[in-house]
């Protein structure tokens, strides 16, 4: 009876969080960056907070207290009669700077939203199930530029000064369900199905001002809605050639199969008073493909230390060779245009975790886990053929909720930069961001850590 009641309470709590998490993913801006103007926006860093605080490593991670979102083979690590639940929140501060016509301009924006909800549980001996709901990509931007009045121009001399505004917001969410099976001692395989859905709205407004001449010019508004729904799969393996009481060495690899995204795009153009006269409206499908991804990693852990290294490759460029866009930055004489195209990406990650004394009864701080990491790679789009380098430095810590407990409260920070290598040459913004995240990990099970959620009482 106690086991049944505990499971019911836990599932009710998860069900209560699920619609709130979905609402958060579809109702507010999760990113604020001009780099999200194209495609499906900025890709989010996958993984629960302990993984992201270590630079995002995790392909080879096997841990009783961490839901692994990078490799379904890790689901087999969940012990019998246990349940692992995770929930995370994340706040972001974006700072964008740009030099236009010799003048430095900057903007800043803050966001705060849900990041992930996940759980892991055993299905049978050496067989585990994992579920996660996480943001895959985010769109959020507001930008404008001007075409200045030029009396010598035969066209613009009659129109006057024109202001162009671009706005967009939305996101793509990933739902993942998978199984991990320890086929034989120290070797596990996993498979997962991933479903992507979301909606992205983009608005373009042209407003003539200071009109001269005999012409009569009015504003025009373009509204584009991208509706996304797609399925793809993932397979993974993990092997621990060293597995003793004192140290564990695990090698892991995962492959994302990829799949057609092909968002349904509904376009509307209005002229005159806003939303008054529809000039054109149609619905098409944008040819776009989610990339295949190959990732591999090594993870080494002892009683105090854990060190991981990951590498991930995504073939965005090979999958989306026909997807090209154009963009504009600056205003007036300083206005520049560029071509945007997808490119293949490589990302390197390294992370470390240190726990001074996990079972120390005298010092609370010695039971904390301290984490740090680094990530370096490239943006998945090029601008006039130039690739944008991006890197991040991460740190965080995990606080056990009580002595010998696996359940914890996790805190993490991340500082990153993007576009500094080519921003001045191409005319783009130099972007810095700072992220602050809080995660909650709940472990329930009949373990020797005092968390006896699934133990049958002697007298019922």
Language model segments and positions:
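Short hydrophobic "helix-edge" motifs at membrane interfaces and signal-peptide entry regions
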Residues: 10, 60-62, 174-175
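Residue-level detector of alpha-helical transmembrane segments in integral membrane proteins
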Residues: 12-13, 65, 284
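N-terminal, post-signal peptide beta-strand-biased segments of exported outer-membrane/organellar beta-barrel
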Residues: 22-126, 131-135
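Outer-membrane beta-barrel porins/channels
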Residues: 25-46, 51-52, 122-460
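Bacterial Sec-dependent N-terminal signal peptides
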Residues: 1-28
């Amino acid at each position: 009876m106690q086991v049944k009641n505990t499971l019911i309470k836990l599932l009710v709590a998860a069900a209560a969080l699920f619609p709130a998490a979905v609402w958060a993913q579809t109702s507010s801006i999760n990113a604020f960056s001009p780099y999200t103007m194209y495609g499906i926006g900025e890709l989010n860093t996958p993984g629960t907070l302990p993984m992201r605080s270590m630079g995002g490593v995790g392909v080879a991670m096997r841990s009783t207290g961490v839901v692994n979102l990078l490799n379904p083979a890790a689901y087999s690590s969940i012990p019998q009669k246990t349940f692992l639940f995770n929930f995370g929140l994340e706040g972001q501060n974006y700072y964008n700077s740009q030099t236009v016509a010799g003048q430095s301009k900057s903007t800043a924006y803050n966001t705060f939203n849900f990041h992930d909800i996940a759980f892991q549980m055993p299905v049978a001996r050496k067989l585990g199930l994992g579920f996660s709901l996480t943001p895959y990509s985010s769109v959020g931007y507001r930008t404008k530029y001007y075409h200045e009045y030029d009396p010598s121009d035969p066209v613009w001399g009659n129109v006057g000064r024109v202001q162009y505004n671009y706005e967009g917001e939305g996101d793509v969410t990933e739902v993942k369900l998978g199984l991990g099976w320890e086929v034989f001692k120290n070797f596990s395989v996993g498979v997962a199905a991933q479903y992507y859905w979301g909606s992205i709205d983009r608005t373009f407004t042209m407003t003539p001002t200071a009109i001269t001449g005999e012409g009569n010019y009015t504003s025009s508004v373009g509204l584009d809605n991208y509706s996304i729904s797609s399925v793809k799969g993932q397979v993974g393996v993990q092997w621990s050639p060293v597995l003793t009481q004192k140290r564990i060495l695990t090698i892991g690899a995962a492959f994302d199969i990829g799949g057609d995204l092909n968002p349904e795009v509904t376009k509307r153009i209005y002229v005159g008073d806003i939303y008054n006269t529809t000039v054109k409206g149609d619905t098409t499908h944008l040819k776009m493909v989610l990339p295949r991804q190959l990732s591999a990693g090594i993870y080494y852990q002892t009683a105090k230390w854990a060190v991981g290294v990951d590498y991930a490759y995504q073939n965005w460029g090979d999958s989306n060779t026909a997807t090209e866009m154009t963009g504009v930055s600056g205003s007036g004489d300083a206005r520049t245009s560029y071509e945007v195209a997808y490119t293949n990406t490589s990302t390197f990650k390294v992370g470390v975790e240190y726990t001074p004394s996990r079972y120390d009864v005298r010092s609370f701080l010695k039971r904390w886990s301290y984490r740090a990491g680094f990530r370096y790679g490239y943006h998945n789009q090029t601008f006039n053929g130039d690739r944008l380098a991006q890197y991040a430095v991460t740190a965080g810590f995990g606080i056990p909720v009580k002595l010998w407990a696996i359940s914890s409260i996790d805190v993490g920070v991340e500082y990153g930069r993007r576009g500094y290598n080519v921003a001045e040459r191409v005319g783009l913004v130099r972007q810095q961001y700072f992220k602050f995240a809080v995660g909650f990990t709940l472990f329930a099970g009949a373990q020797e850590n005092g968390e006896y959620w699934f133990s049958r009482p002697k007298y019922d």
